[in-house]
Each structure stands twice: as C-alpha cells, then as structure tokens.
A protein has these predicted regions:
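Structured soluble/peripheral alpha/beta segments that form catalytic or ligand/cofactor-binding pockets
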Residues: 1-289
Length: 289
C-alpha cells in the first residue's frame, strides 16, 4: 500500500498541474496473479505535513495517533474498487532512524518507523470483504530525488532479529559508471532497538527463475551478502520463493525492477556473541535489459 506524493503524477501531468498524489495497492491472489489498484489526485486534493505522518490523497487517508497508523484507502483496478480499513501497530523498538543517502548529485531520504509491525482490519474488493488480525506488516517513508535511480533493498523478520539492508545508486552508478566503496548498509534490530549497522559492498545473485509480470523476465534464484563493522561480521543468505518484475523506462537506460519474497538465514558474530536467525522477508533489485 503506497501513499505517493510527487511531481508529474498521473497519465497527463501537464493537464493536472506540476504535482499531485497517487494511491497504489498491489494484491497477490492465492493463485499467484497480481492485481493493481490506483487512484490519482491533483495537488488541491493532497494534504501532507513534514512534522507528522498524516497524509490525505483524494478520498484516502493515513492518520498516526499514539504510535498507531490508521489507513482508509480507496483505489480502483480491473478487478473493481478496493477499500481498505487497517490499523498498523509497530512493534516496540523495531525501527530504523531517518537517514539521507547521497550519491554525487542526488539526495534521497529514508526512515522505517515500523520495521516489524502487526496489522488488523478489513479489506474489500467490490462486494467481497475479508478481515485480517495481527498479520505481519512493515512501514517506511521515502523522500527526495528518485529519477533514474536504482537501489538494492530488503527487509525481513526472524525469530529474534529484524533486518534491513539497502543502498541507492544514482544515474551514473546505474549505468555502471563510477565507484563507491561499501555503498550498502545492513541493520540488525532486536527487542531493545538497533543492535548493529554493518557495511557491505556487493550482493552475489545466483541462479535463474521465471518471474511474474514483465514478459520474459528472469529473476535470481538466490543471493548472499556479507556485512562487516570492526570485529563484527554476519553472512545473509536468501532463497527466493517468488518474484514479480516490472519493466521500467528511464531517460538514460532500460531496466527491470524485481520485487521478491523469500526465506533467509543469518549467521555471524556481533559484540563478541554468536548470532543466528531465520525467517521470511521481501527484497528488491534491478537488472538492466
């Protein structure tokens, strides 16, 4: 579920003004088919505040009170109109503080108020409704410049630890130009908060598997990375269980955007103690055409 505010939103940005808002809901059915629901709003129907998390985009709203996010979402797609009424409750101390990521001439910001959270409420498509109770959820905020930008990202939840990794490439890095040492971070979070933030410089993708979405798209079957900081080090391995690809067009290059679900294992040493965990997560990457 995405509340998006930005420039040139909608099929005809010039006709609707310089900026606006979009609601985006993506639903994966039990048969593996993805359904997409959207709703665009002009600038006059958008409300947001840099001092709080409340956002209004047309008929859709999110309100944060006492740490709980209340979502009321309206969007439409080929399957009909979607309506969501949800409450998202982040788990205590399971967050990642705000950071701003720089690469040459662009700046992008990121914060994760709900690295691990639970969601409850009602979801409807047309006249069919269902309820969810205390299902696993995640919530983040992004801001800044994202034109011609690519990234590596992942968030996962184990028995003891939550993890988050990422890094952003500007247009030059996305085309394979330039060099940056250890451009990625890996954050490990437990019930007391951030336990360690490590650095790594590459992700090793292996194998091939068909992806849903874009025709002919091939996703990685697995990947690994190794993060270090001082004497601390961990190894993360992910087996991809499902992937969907979106064909993206940019001013300077063509690319495929992959959203993947999979299982992870984590092993290493933090603060002189062994760590080991496993669980499920969601991961994103790009591949050029």
């Amino acid at each position: 579920i995405t509340f998006l505010v930005g420039g040139g939103v909608g099929p005809s940005p010039a006709a609707s003004g310089r900026w606006g808002g979009r609601m985006l809901v993506t639903h994966r059915r039990p048969d593996g088919v993805y359904e997409r629901f959207t709703s665009d709003a002009p600038a006059g129907a958008v409300r947001f505040d840099t001092a709080r998390a409340d956002v209004t985009i047309g008929r859709s709203t999110v309100r944060q009170r006492n740490g709980v996010y209340a979502l009321d979402v309206h969007a439409a797609g080929n399957a009909g109109e979607a309506r969501l009424e949800l409450e998202v409750q982040p788990l205590r101390h399971r967050y990642f503080p705000p950071v701003e990521l720089r690469d040459d001439d662009f700046l992008s910001g990121y914060v994760v108020p709900g690295l691990a959270a639970s969601a409850s409420g009602r979801l409807c498509v047309r006249a069919r409704c269902g309820r969810v109770t205390d299902v696993a959820a995640y919530h983040d905020h992004n801001w800044g410049v994202w034109r011609d930008v690519t990234w590596e990202w992942g968030a996962a939840r184990g028995q003891e630890l939550s993890l988050l990794y990422g890094g952003v490439y500007g247009p030059e890095r996305a085309r394979g130009e330039g060099a940056v040492n250890s451009p990625f971070f890996l954050s490990l979070v437990d019930s007391l908060g951030v336990r360690q933030v490590l650095r790594f410089d590459r992700i090793a993708y292996e194998g091939e598997a068909p992806a849903a979405g874009a025709s002919g798209a091939i996703a990685p079957r697995r990947f690994t990375l190794a993060g270090t900081r001082g004497r601390d080090s961990v190894a993360l391995a992910v087996e991809v269980e499902h992937a969907v690809a979106t064909d993206m067009s940019a001013a300077s290059f063509r690319r495929l955007f992959f959203q993947m679900r999979g299982r992870f294992t984590l092993r290493g040493r933090i603060g002189g103690a062994e760590v080991s965990d496993s669980g499920q997560g969601f991961f994103e990457t790009y591949r050029t055409r």
